[in-house]
C-alpha cells in the first residue's frame, strides 16, 4: 500500500489493480471513498481496462478470432508494479502477459499515476501500444464515494451536479448482457445544473451518458457548490480524471 499525504488529505493506493483505496479528508475528519464492504460492493475505485462495461455475451471478435473477457476487463484484478514514487505522486505499471493475451491479444503497457496537490487528486492513465497494429481499447475510472458524506444527512439530501446544463440524455443497460440499449433514450431534467439523488434512481443499474455531454460532475448538498467532483478530461497523450475535495 502506498500513501500520499499533506495537511489536507491522506490518500492510499494499492498495488492490486493500482486501485485508489482511500481519500481521508483531514479537515472534516471523514473518509471520502467507499469502504469496499463485500456484502454490498467489494471495491473502492477500480480501473476499467481494456474494456469499460461488458462485451455482448462476454465475447469480442478481434482479427477474426473470438476472445472472452469479463465485465470491465482484467486490469482491476491484476498486480501492478510501482515504478516511481515521489513526495506527492505514485506511478504503477501493468504490462501484457501470456495470460492477458488470452482475453485481449495485444502487447501493451498501462501506466496509472496518482498525484496529490492540496485538496486536488489527479488520476492519469497512459496506455502504450507495443504492437505494430491498431489496438482497440477503452479505459475508465469507477470510484465509489461515501454518501451520505456528512453526519446527520441521508443519501436523498444530496444532489448530482453538472456543468450548468438544463438536461441530459441517457441510456440504460440491458441487465441480461450488461450492454447499453442505444435504441431508447431518456431525459434527466436538471435544475440549476443539478438533480436530487432519488430513491430507486439506479435500480436499473448505471445511467449511460454519451456524446460528450458531461465534462464535469459532482456530489453536493444543495447549499454547497460542490463537495466532491470528478472532471474527466483528455490530455495529450493520456486521459485522466481529477477529484476536488471541498
Model region roles, listed by residue range:
Residues 1, 8-10, 87-91, 109-111, ...:
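Intrinsic-disorder/low-complexity, polar/charged segments enriched in Ser/Thr/Lys/Arg/Asp/Glu/Gln
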Residues 5-7, 17, 54, 74-76, ...:
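Residues that act as N-cap/strand-start positions at coil-to-secondary-structure junctions
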Residues 13, 64, 123-127:
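Buried hydrophobic-core signal for structured, non-transmembrane domains
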Residues 96-143, 150:
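Acidic, contiguous internal or C-terminal segments within carbohydrate-active enzymes
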Amino acid at each position: 500500500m502506498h500513501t500520499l499525504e499533506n495537511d489536507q488529505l491522506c490518500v492510499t493506493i494499492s498495488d492490486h489493480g493500482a486501485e485508489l483505496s482511500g481519500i481521508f479528508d483531514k479537515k472534516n475528519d471523514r473518509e471520502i471513498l467507499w469502504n469496499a464492504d463485500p456484502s454490498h460492493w467489494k471495491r473502492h475505485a477500480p480501473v476499467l481496462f481494456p474494456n469499460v462495461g461488458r462485451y455482448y455475451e462476454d465475447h469480442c471478435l478481434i482479427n477474426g478470432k473470438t476472445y472472452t473477457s469479463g465485465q470491465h476487463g482484467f486490469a482491476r484484478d491484476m498486480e501492478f508494479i510501482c515504478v516511481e514514487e515521489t513526495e506527492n505522486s505514485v506511478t504503477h505499471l501493468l504490462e501484457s502477459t501470456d495470460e492477458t493475451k488470452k482475453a485481449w491479444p495485444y502487447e501493451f503497457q498501462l501506466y496509472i499515476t496518482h498525484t496529490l496537490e492540496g485538496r486536488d487528486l489527479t488520476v492519469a492513465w497512459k496506455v502504450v501500444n507495443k504492437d505494430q497494429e491498431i489496438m482497440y481499447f477503452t479505459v475508465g475510472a469507477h470510484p465509489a464515494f461515501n454518501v451520505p458524506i456528512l453526519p446527520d444527512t441521508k443519501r436523498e439530501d444530496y444532489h448530482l451536479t453538472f456543468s450548468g446544463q438544463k438536461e441530459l440524455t441517457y441510456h440504460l443497460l440491458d441487465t441480461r448482457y450488461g450492454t447499453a440499449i442505444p435504441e431508447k433514450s431518456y431525459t434527466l431534467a436538471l435544475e440549476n445544473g443539478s438533480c436530487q439523488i432519488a430513491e430507486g434512481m439506479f435500480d436499473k443499474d448505471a445511467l449511460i451518458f454519451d456524446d460528450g455531454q458531461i465534462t464535469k460532475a459532482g456530489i453536493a448538498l444543495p447549499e454547497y457548490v460542490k463537495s466532491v467532483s470528478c472532471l474527466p478530461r483528455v490530455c495529450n497523450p493520456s486521459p485522466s480524471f481529477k477529484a476536488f475535495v471541498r
